[in-house]
Structure formats: C-alpha cells, structure tokens
A protein has these predicted regions:
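Electropositive, glycine-dotted interaction segments
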Residues: 1-139, 143
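Short beta-strand micro-motifs in enzyme catalytic cores
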Residues: 88, 156-160, 268
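Residues embedded in well-ordered beta-strands within globular domains across many folds
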Residues: 88-91, 149, 270
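Short, surface-exposed amphipathic charged segments that create phosphate/polyanion-binding patches used
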Residues: 104-105, 162-163, 285-290
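C-terminal lobe/lid and adjacent interdomain/linker elements of RecA-like ASCE P-loop ATPase modules
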Residues: 140, 231-330
Length: 330
C-alpha cells in the first residue's frame, strides 16, 4: 500500500505479460502516489520484480531533491524483499555437524553444519547466551554435563565438545554426540542468535527503515528429540522471540508438543486440514474451530488432537453458545 500525504493508493506494483511474443519481458505499473497516470516499465521475467524497481524509480527527482513518492515506492519494495530474505528455514542435519569447520564460518547455516563455529563465537562474544545454552544442555542431557567447549585444530578449525565430570579428559566430541542432542543444539543456537547470528543474505541500508526481522521456520520440531527437549525449546522460543524480535513458525504432528502449549499458546496454533469436498488444503486458527471451547474443557490440546478432535473446520467458526454454557450463563 502506497501513501502520499493523506491519500492511500492501491498495490505497489501490478504486472502483466508482454503482448510481444518475441519479447519475454513483463510490464509493471508502479503505483507511486503521484498525480496522473501511474507509469509502466519493462521488467525481466527471470528476476523478482521488486528488486528491479531501483532501476526505474529513484528517491531523488531530476533536480536532485528528495522525492517522497519515489522513496515510498522503494521502501515498500524493500519491506517485501527484506521479509523474503529474512526467512530462515532451519533443517538441522546431525551427521553434517560432526566434523571440524573453519572457525570464521560463524553464521549458522540452514543445515547446522557449522554449529561448532557458531557456538565458538557465541562463547567469545555473548557469554550470557552461551551460559543459557549450557543450562539448557544440562537440563536435557541424559548424563552429567559440566560445560560446552570447542576444540581447535592446528589449522584453526573448530569442533564442539562436551566436558563431563571434573577430569579434563572426560570430554565427548561432536562426532560422538547423539543426533537428538545435536539437533537440539542447532535449534537452540538459532533461537538465541536469530537477530544477528544466522546465515542470511546481507541486508540493504533501507532495512533499518523498514524494520526488517528474521522469520525462523522449523519443520517437525520434535524430530529426533525427546519430548522433554521439545518442551524446553518451546520455553526458549517464548523467551527469545521477545528478546531478538524474530518470528518463529513451527510445524508439528507431536501430541506431546501440543500438550506443552498452554494459556496464550493456543492462540498461536494454526490447523492445516484438507477439505474432502474440494480436495483443497485450508488453514484455520485452532481457537476458531467449531466446538473449541467445549473440547478444551475436556482435555489438553494434544490429547484432543490424538482423538481426532480439533483437526478440521466443520461448520461454524464461532461457538459463543458453548462459551456461555461453560460459564454457566445461558
């Protein structure tokens, strides 16, 4: 949405295919907030259109003065690009985390393969977050853990190790850690460093003006994790999202994980279901499903889902009568 003064205009950019069969370009109409018809520009069809806008629109007019309309267009485009660029799909692959990695490779990658380097820089630069990571590991590990540490090779490559007991030689290197613990560590590090410790593309000087944030996506959070680990991560998500400003989207089929959500947590659950009539998938908020209030009075979310309840949108998206009945005011 473009705004110029008190007036608001439609979408930022409308595109259509070229009528020239010999020209594969797209034509885009830029809604710039100025008086008169909106200009049309040619765009390459092999690149995102919004990223090409700076070639056609400027924040300065022909005399070098600030152009508020042009700046609005560029800021709108940058807001969308920053949101796309900031989407970080974390898919930890434990067997890739068991080798030495260059110490300078610190931005956590989507596979978690450079976890050791990320933890190394966390220990050096953010001791408070490193301390929290240690506390989490002690809570979920099935053996006594003194501290996380990093071993360094002669080539200055690093590998994560866990120090156990009091003897200096009681250590377990990353190559011997369980898949579940490595996956847990990768997710925890991503959450703790979501504001500046992930391997996302470099931003633009305009990002600060559009308040760009990271969107961390984790599919099947419970995979390879003991239910207690998953519950700890849920608590960490609640804490870190307010600290880092990041948004987190999780997918899950775990009843135990759903049971760990309580209070306001239910308001953030979205159910994905397939409409049998149309064979299309739909999304609906859990609290908007018919019968939600009555169902929640009879059990926990995960238990209800395992019984086949609260898994699809039936008829009505509101159930005020059930709420009044539960409150005893009919």
């Amino acid at each position: 949405m473009i705004q110029s003064g008190g007036a608001k205009y439609g979408s930022l950019l409308d595109a259509k295919a070229s009528n020239d069969e010999n020209n594969p370009a797209l034509w885009g109409q830029v809604h710039n907030g100025r008086k008169g018809p909106n200009p049309w520009f040619p765009f390459r069809d092999s690149r995102i259109l919004l990223a090409q806008l700076p070639s056609h629109v400027s924040a300065k007019d022909t005399e070098g003065r600030d152009d508020p309309a042009g700046r609005q267009v560029l800021l709108g485009a940058q807001a969308v690009i920053a949101a796309l660029r900031g989407t970080f799909h974390l898919d930890p692959v434990p067997h890739l985390m068991r080798s030495y990695v260059p110490a300078r490779d610190v931005g956590l990658r989507r596979t978690g393969e450079n976890l050791s380097a990320s933890i190394s820089v966390l220990a050096d630069r953010e001791p408070n977050k490193f301390r929290r990571l240690n506390e989490l590991v002690r809570l979920v590990a099935d053996h006594p853990v003194r501290s996380l540490a990093v071993a360094q090779s002669n080539l200055r490559d690093v590998m994560l190790i866990i120090q156990e007991g009091n003897a200096p030689d009681e250590v377990t290197p990353a190559r011997e850690l369980s898949d579940g613990l490595l996956r847990f560590l990768a997710i925890a590090v991503a959450l703790l460093t979501a504001d500046r410790g992930l391997d996302v593309d470099a931003g633009s000087p305009l990002d600060a003006q559009v308040k760009a944030r990271v969107l961390l996506v984790i599919e099947e959070l419970e995979n390879g994790l003991h239910p207690s680990m998953a519950a700890r991560l849920l608590s960490l998500i609640r804490e870190t999202t307010s600290e880092t400003g990041a948004q987190v989207v999780l997918t899950t089929h775990s009843h135990a994980l759903l049971n760990a959500l309580s209070g306001d947590g239910a308001h953030s659950i979205v159910v994905c279901y397939r409409d049998e009539a149309t064979q299309r998938s739909h999304l609906a908020r859990l609290i908007e499903l018919a019968g939600y209030a009555q169902a929640m009075a009879q059990g926990r979310i995960g238990d209800l889902v395992s019984e086949g309840r609260l898994v699809r949108h039936e008829e009505s998206s509101a159930d005020p009568g059930a709420v009044l009945h539960l409150l005893g005011i009919e």
